[in-house]
Amino acid sequence: PPRSTLFPYTTLFRSDVDGVKVKGTKFAVYAPSATAVSVIGDFNFWDGRRLPMAKSLLGHWVLFVPGLGAGLRYKYEIKDPFGNRLPHKADPVGFYHEQYPSFASIISDHRTYTWHDAEWQKSQLGNKLERPMSIYELHMGSWKKSENGQPLTYRELAVDLLDYVKNMGYTHIELMPIMEHPFSGSWGYQPTGLFAPTSRFGTIDDFKFFVDTFHQNGIGIILDWVPAHFPTDAFGLAKFDGTCVYEYEDPRRGWHPDWNSLIYDFGRDTVRRFLIASALIWLDLYHIDGLRVDAVASMLYWDYSRKEGEWIPNVDGGNINYEAVSFLKWFNEEVNRKHPNAVTIAEESTAFTGVSRPTSTGGLGFNFKWNMGWMHDSLEYMQTDPFFRKYHHGEMSFSMIYAYNENFILSISHDEVTHGKHSLLYKMPGDEWQQAANLRAYLGYQYAHPGKKLNFMGSEFGQGSEWNDNAQLDWWLLKYPKHQGVQKLVQDLNEMYKKEPALWKRDYDPDAFRWLDVNDAEHSIFAMLRSGDDGDCIMAVSNFTPVPYVAYRLGVPTPGTYKVILNTDDKKYWGSGYGTGSDEIVASNISYQNNYHSIVLDLPPIDRKS
């Protein structure tokens, strides 16, 4: 792999021994307080007496072992400052690891794969904010199972998942963490191998093939990356050399009460370099297109999920973790400097200022931020009985008050369809038909609203049950017209979205959006206008009631003919086919709603009407 100036790691190596070039493996591990470190593995009967390592002044232990090549298992035997032998440790910067029960690291060779995605890399040049992004979030282990009930491998997913995502029209996929992790029930959010794709689904080359194949078919890949915390497994980073090498020593800073995990010491230079080296490896070695940083809010606040007296204030007496702020800025600067085409995305659940603003202006430097406020408010509105929605009208429109404070992604993620929250379909009120109609209307509203798009797997066809990470999606539902209709709608929304620059080119330009009607709470109607370049416009009108509105007048800014390009109530989507009166609507010179022109159209209901 490429040399890292940030953190040393074990690598295949060619060394000079008495003037002769000798192939082997150079091991390197950071354990500054250890009194002894040895490499143990298949090659020395796991005997710590055979291959002791030498300690550098900086606290790194290194050893070159001739003749060792890829595929051999290894760990480190470490003695703490008092000479006590610790549980055998996996390599913190290992590129490949075994599964339970050993969790051993495996020597890897990154020179065996040849990439074929040069055209994709060239295509990613340019302004990241002015591109369409419709992201399909998924959990690799539960998207689909093989006939024997096992998760699909990287290479199987490179066929089945690719075909599906490409056919559905998504621009990107986002993978819930595939960094190596011991506990499947963590969904990957408690990783121990920040440099390694999990071996659950195949080899390193298999994962590279997966990424490469998606790129060759024009689809980007974003990874969830977890620098906020790590698990306490004895073979992992916890008390790595008998002391707190990676975590804060004081549990008021180093222990996460929500997840029973340990928090990285963001003020320690070696920890910062370790984490940023991990981020860059995914972009360097695995050609990943972006990283979504998980649980940013838990990093930013000392008092996150802590009661009074359970946290230590910063030097100014406040609750902001300046060390984490500094780390996140450096992370974004390094990614932008070394991989300017890559995107960084923050899952940040508070109103922290400037998350997606440049570090040069005081921001954290992310390219995008999940809009969790929009997600919460809009879902709360959609779960309200349509009869009472008029009293909650502002929940659906409030997002535009702050829409341009950040570069938002409208995310409806895995967090919304688990832990008793119901599937997206079953959040909707009403009978079977009304639930589907509400879901289709909601998805249409999401695609019309400014901001990039993200939806979790299963939502695109109206998954009925909550997401279960131990089972595959309910693919059998697609034999029913209702679910076929939702899936067809999402497919058409994606294709329309990509073809219409007005829906993405100026997502973050306030001059490219205006409400045409945002005050009709009585009828629960919203109408918006999105503008692209050269006068290109898209108008979206939403009726969130079970009542059809005939000859509904709407003010428009320009004369001419307005063409209906998508109707979520179309029969092909399992809608009623109520229609809008005409597929082409000519604007009149009748002034209305502070516009010089207006159109008249019929608005379909979220109910079965003929």
Region annotations inferred by a language model:
Residues 196-200, 315-322, 431-433, 477-484:
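A short acidic, glycine-rich active-site loop
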Residues 29, 76, 138, 165, ...:
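Conserved, mostly hydrophobic/aromatic
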Residues 1-5:
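Short, exposed "boundary/linker" segments that immediately precede the start
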Residues 8-131, 155-165, 169, 433-436, ...:
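Carbohydrate-interacting/catalytic domains
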Residues 31-33, 57, 67, 139-144, ...:
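Short, flexible loop/turn elements at secondary-structure junctions
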Residues 287-289, 304-472, 498-554, 558-569, ...:
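Conserved alpha/beta catalytic core and glycan-binding cleft of carbohydrate-active enzymes
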Residues 160-161, 206, 210, 271-282, ...:
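Alpha-helical packing segments of well-folded alpha/beta enzyme cores
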Residues 95-96, 118-130, 139-319, 601:
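Substrate-binding/active-site clefts of carbohydrate-active enzymes
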